[in-house]
Regions:
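A compositional/biophysical signature of low hydrophobicity enriched in polar/charged and small residues
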Residues: 1-97
Length: 97
């Protein structure tokens, strides 16, 4: 299953409602699971981004659907990185001439 790294930042609305952040994170985790995925890690962070999560989802379409649904709520903005494991990269690199 593809892995995605999510860099998440609060919007003005999201930070105003910060007391609901754990509830919103749990709802996001449930949405990922309903779509057949799994939240691997999740961290609140200090620095350039407010929250970082790693999720597995069945495919890019599932990822886009989950993240659009998250975005329309207006509490966060996301940057999504599709991640590749060392073994996945090894397969690609082994085919290089």
């Amino acid at each position: 299953m593809p892995t995605y790294v999510l860099l998440i930042d609060w919007t003005d609305q999201g930070i105003r409602n910060v007391k609901d952040t754990i509830k919103r994170a749990e709802a996001f985790k449930s949405a990922v699971e309903r779509s057949g995925g799994k939240m691997l890690d999740a961290y609140y962070t200090m620095g350039q981004h407010d929250f970082v999560a790693t999720v597995e989802l069945p495919n890019d379409e599932s990822a886009m659907s989950i993240l659009l649904a998250l975005g329309v709520r207006g509490n966060v903005r996301t940057t999504t990185l599709k991640a590749f494991s060392l073994s996945e990269v090894e397969k690609v690199v082994s085919k290089l001439s």
